[in-house]
């Protein structure tokens, strides 16, 4: 079929041409668009417009991919092979762990539609992208920091701890890290923190997708364990429904007791300094510098 001439293609039904050159995105033979433009059928003109629109979208996506790979490309050209993107998910929720992911993509990796997980609202699309990343990545790993750790060392440092665990979980040692906004502590690998990195680096975007989808699945499992709180729907974030059920049903073991709405539900002072609050909740809590994975 790929050797069909333009004349032969014009003998096909327009529905077949649509399936081949729009739905399946088969490369368009030279001269086909011009032949469709000259075809007296209105449907042929509409098909030519759809093919051109698809081609323009493909060009734009290709340009977006190249732009998202500029940090990786610079490092590849310097001789680095294994570049890991690192990102986290779940800093703001009132419940559940904070989860981080690290992803090492092969040189020249492309995945249509891959972007910062916050920009991809369709959960099924995120899952599809996550499966493609896991399938094609050189290596990937996730790490987490539990609620107790969040309350002991604060959410910022717990997020860093989850990131470090993700990097340490990789099956290959990365040559360089690209990290969303921060740098990973206690890590000897050279690294670069990129503000809004999940929107500027393909590797970080991949890690963002893995962290988000992994955490969402874990929250769905917690929803089965703690029914009635809507955890599968709001993922622990402080939605009006979550705040209401927190007041009505009380605090769960998976709620972050260092977060103001949870402290309020427990009847604890919401304005306590972190050190005083941690002393209240965890009398024997280790110092921040003593925290280990």
Curated annotation (Swiss-Prot):
Catalytic activity field: Endonucleolytic cleavage to 5'-phosphomonoester
GO biological process per UniProt: DNA replication, removal of RNA primer; mismatch repair
Keywords of the record: Cytoplasm, Endonuclease, Hydrolase, Manganese, Metal-binding, Nuclease
Paired cysteines (S-S): none
Annotated binding of a divalent metal cation, by residue: 87-88, 180
Cellular component per GO, a single term: ribonuclease H2 complex
Residue numbers spanned by region Disordered: 273-293
Cofactor note: Manganese or magnesium. Binds 1 divalent metal ion per monomer in the absence of substrate. May bind a second metal ion after substrate binding.
GO molecular function terms noted in the UniProt entry: manganese ion binding; RNA binding; RNA-DNA hybrid ribonuclease activity
Record has Metal-binding as a keyword: yes
Source organism superkingdom: Bacteria
Subcellular location: Cytoplasm
Domain RNase H type-2: 81-271
Pfam families: RNase_HII
Catalytic activity, EC: 3.1.26.4
Family: Belongs to the RNase HII family.
Role according to the record: Endonuclease that specifically degrades the RNA of RNA-DNA hybrids.
The protein, known as: Ribonuclease HII
Taxonomic source organism: Myxococcus xanthus (strain DK1622)
């Amino acid at each position: 079929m790929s050797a069909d001439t333009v004349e032969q293609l014009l003998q096909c039904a327009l529905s077949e041409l649509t399936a081949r050159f729009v739905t399946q995105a088969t490369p368009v033979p030279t001269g086909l668009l011009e032949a469709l433009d000259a075809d007296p059928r209105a449907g042929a003109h509409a098909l030519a417009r759809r093919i051109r629109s698809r081609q323009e979208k493909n060009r734009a996506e290709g340009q977006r991919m190249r732009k998202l790979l500029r940090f990786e490309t610079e490092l590849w050209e310097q001789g680095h092979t294994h570049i890991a993107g690192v990102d986290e998910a779940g800093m703001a929720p009132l419940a559940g762990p904070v989860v981080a992911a690290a992803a090492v993509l092969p040189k020249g990796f492309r995945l249509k539609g891959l972007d910062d997980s916050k920009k991809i609202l369709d959960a099924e699309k995120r899952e599809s992208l996550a499966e493609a990343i896991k399938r094609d990545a050189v290596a990937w790993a996730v790490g987490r920091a539990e609620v107790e750790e969040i309350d002991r060392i604060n959410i910022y440092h717990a997020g860093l701890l989850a990131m470090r665990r993700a990097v340490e979980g990789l099956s290959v040692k990365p040559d360089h890290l690209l990290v969303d906004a921060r740098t990973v502590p206690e890590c000897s690998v050279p690294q670069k923190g990129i503000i809004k990195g999940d929107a500027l680096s393909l590797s970080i975007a991949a890690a963002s997708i893995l962290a988000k989808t992994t955490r969402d699945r874990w929250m769905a499992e917690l929803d089965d364990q703690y029914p009635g709180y809507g955890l599968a729907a709001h993922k622990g974030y402080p939605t009006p429904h979550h705040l209401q059920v927190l007041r009505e049903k009380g605090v769960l073991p998976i709620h972050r007791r260092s977060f103001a709405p949870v402290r309020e539900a427990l009847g604890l002072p919401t304005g306590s300094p972190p050190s005083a609050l941690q002393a209240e909740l965890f009398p024997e809590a280790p110092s921040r510098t003593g925290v280990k994975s």
